[in-house]
Amino acid sequence: MKHFEANFDGLVGPTHNYAGLSFGNVASQSNAAQVSNPKDAAKQGLKKAKALADMGMVQGMLAPQERPDIHTLRRVGFTGSDADVLSQAAKASPVLLQACASASSMWTANAATVSPSADSDDGKLHFTPANLVDKLHRSIEPVTTGNILKAIFTDERYFAHHQHLPEHPHFGDEGAANHTRLCHDYGQAGVEVFVYGRSVADLSRPAPVKYPARQTLEASQAVARLHQLSDDRTVYMQQNPDVIDQGVFHNDVIAVGNQNVLFYHEQAFLETQAKLAEIDKKMHGNMYFIEVPTAKVSVQDAVKSYLFNTQIITLSDGNMAIIAPTDCQENPAVHAYLNELVTLNTPIKAVHYFDVKQSMQNGGGPACLRLRVAMNETELAAVNPQVMMNDALFARLNQWVDKHYRDRLSTQDLADPQLLMESRTALDELTQIMKLGSVYQFQR
């Protein structure tokens, strides 16, 4: 039976804007109040996803969330018609309206943690949506995320869906952005690496000072239990709090793994050598640990270029390639390092650059835009086929974007009732294109 890693990319929503909501995310905050281009953002994402499908990768798309989120605004006391709710929120709390209008669900690396059937004790593919409690604008996502995942991975013979963890900082969970699965072959049992920023129970552990540590050890352990992962299939690593304070808000900004490759910055982790030894032992050797020294790429350059927020993919010939943002090309130190990397004795033999600037300016690179799902051909056959990228879906979604999306959006536009109507009309049509059923609040 064939096994592979599929990527499910987040389709950028119609309200993509730059509100600077993500404290600790340097790009998000530094581009606050700029005018965005939702149409370009969506097309950049589609182009990247289609390119991977054309390289022979299994590629799907995840639908965006309903925004502005009128349901949440009503929960906090705004009343009347939908237009009244938007108007009241804009006057009383512009920041709250911005949070409820964020298109942040595009970064599906935060949508959920996924464990393949080869790793779990019950032989099922497990999904747990991330609760994202650290950021208001993202904490309103997990219920709809769960609905969308269930509409795509529906067959209970193969797929197990869990509720997101309790909505409390004790269980702060940021999903796959702090999780990477290592294996020798996608169909073999692997080792799942959970990276956390702090421990709630063990206050003797170091923690960042300037920016929040969004992922707790306790959340990572809970997800591993839900997914029925044994101790010899898991490794827990603490992210270096110093790099969190330098803008590394998720581990996928400072490290990325694929199969038997872990690509990471010298400063990424605490107790690095001991933890790499644990990984090597549980993987039974034959690992490539590619450490990028600070002398070649500073943490600042890594964050600015998103060198590690890249995708490492395995091509049909067995070689690996890096999918990088064009920002890596534009940074001299990073570009020089990547040119050197493909000549070294590692499986990584090529780098492909993509323009995802609309996402980058909000603090999300190629890796943020995708959720990885390792699966076999039987499981893939049970996936909703209408979300899988091919020539027809690419053309259909581009037409859909052209029909429904604006080419400029400012934070002032978020209170426009017409934007809400445009967004709902678009999403209603999208659920028909993708055969998702009624996954949104407004459809019920």
Curated annotation (Swiss-Prot):
Keywords recorded for this protein, A-Z: Arginine metabolism, Hydrolase
Residues that hold substrate according to the record: 19-28, 110, 137-138, 214, 252, 362
Residues spanning the signal sequence: none
Pathway terms, separated by semicolons: Amino-acid degradation; L-arginine degradation via AST pathway; L-glutamate and succinate from L-arginine: step 2/5
Enzyme class: hydrolase
Coiled coil: none
Protein name listed in UniProt: N-succinylarginine dihydrolase
